[in-house]
């Protein structure tokens, strides 16, 4: 009986050793997967860590944002974070492209004054579209960065609260102290667009009082010229903050 008891005890010890080895194996695997996830978050954060949106390497951004390297539950976490980042930066890229591709900063040049004046229908339409795009991007960004919206991305993973802090830490890189940086960056262009629109309105209103002479706009009375100068001063003030 002692021999059988020894065998039973030996088997029990062996089972415990195997269980312990399996437990530590699981722990190591989980840690490796967590580290892989953290590496992806850090790489993504470094890619977008620029002073201006225009400085982001979009090829590098798209490569990492579309890749999926994590495994297990961290794969769901990675997908949630990258989906959130993609949505956030697609909005910013949209407004950046709209501003960069627009000719709004050329609308008061002599060539455009002659070609599109005095009604400036083409210029007005472009300004209206640009303003609508910028306002839409601001609205979408505000909605997406709302706390409840960010939580929704995590909720869709179906993961337990245990993983929530990892998600929150990752997406907080897009908020925190820089939460309003994007919105603030659009305020000056918005003011510039508004100021240009005001100048065009004034030129249409006074279309019989000015003409383009070479590289200059010439008014046929001082009051009209002085008022035009005030509009230009307002435009320069708005543009100076860009």
Role assignments for model-derived ranges:
Residues 1-5:
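Positively charged n-region of N-terminal signal peptides that target proteins for export
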Residues 6-11, 20-120:
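Leu/Val/Ala/Ile-rich N-terminal alpha-helices, chiefly Sec-type signal peptides and the beginnings
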Residues 16-18:
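Hydrophobic core
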Residues 25, 90, 158, 239-242:
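Short, flexible coil/linker elements and helix-boundary hinge sites characteristic
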Residues 35, 42, 62, 79, ...:
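Detector for Asparagine
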Residues 43-53, 66, 70, 82, ...:
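Generic surface-pattern signal
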Residues 100-212:
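Extended amphipathic alpha-helical interaction segments
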Residues 205-242:
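A cross-kingdom marker for long, charged
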């Amino acid at each position: 009986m002692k021999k059988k008891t020894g065998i039973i005890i030996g088997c029990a010890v062996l089972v415990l050793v195997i269980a312990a080895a399996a437990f530590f194996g699981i722990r190591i695997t989980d840690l490796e997967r967590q580290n892989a996830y953290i590496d992806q978050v850090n790489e993504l954060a470094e890619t977008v860590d620029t002073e201006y949106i225009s400085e982001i390497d979009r090829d590098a951004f798209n490569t990492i944002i579309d890749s999926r390297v994590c495994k297990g539950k961290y794969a769901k976490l990675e997908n949630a974070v990258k989906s959130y980042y993609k949505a956030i930066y697609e909005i910013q890229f949209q407004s950046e492209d709209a501003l960069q591709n627009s000719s709004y900063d050329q609308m008061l040049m002599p060539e455009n004054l002659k070609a599109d004046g005095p009604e400036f229908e083409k210029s007005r339409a472009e300004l209206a579209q640009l303003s609508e795009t910028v306002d839409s991007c601001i609205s979408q960004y505000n909605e997406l960065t709302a706390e409840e919206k960010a939580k929704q991305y995590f909720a869709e993973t179906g993961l337990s609260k245990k993983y929530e802090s990892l998600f929150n830490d990752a997406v907080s890189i897009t908020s925190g102290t820089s939460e309003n940086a994007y919105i603030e960056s659009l305020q000056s262009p918005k003011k510039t667009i508004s100021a240009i629109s005001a100048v065009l309105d004034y030129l249409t209103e006074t279309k019989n009082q000015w003409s383009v002479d070479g590289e200059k706009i010439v008014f046929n009375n001082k009051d009209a010229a002085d008022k035009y100068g005030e509009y230009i001063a307002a435009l320069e003030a708005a543009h100076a903050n860009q």
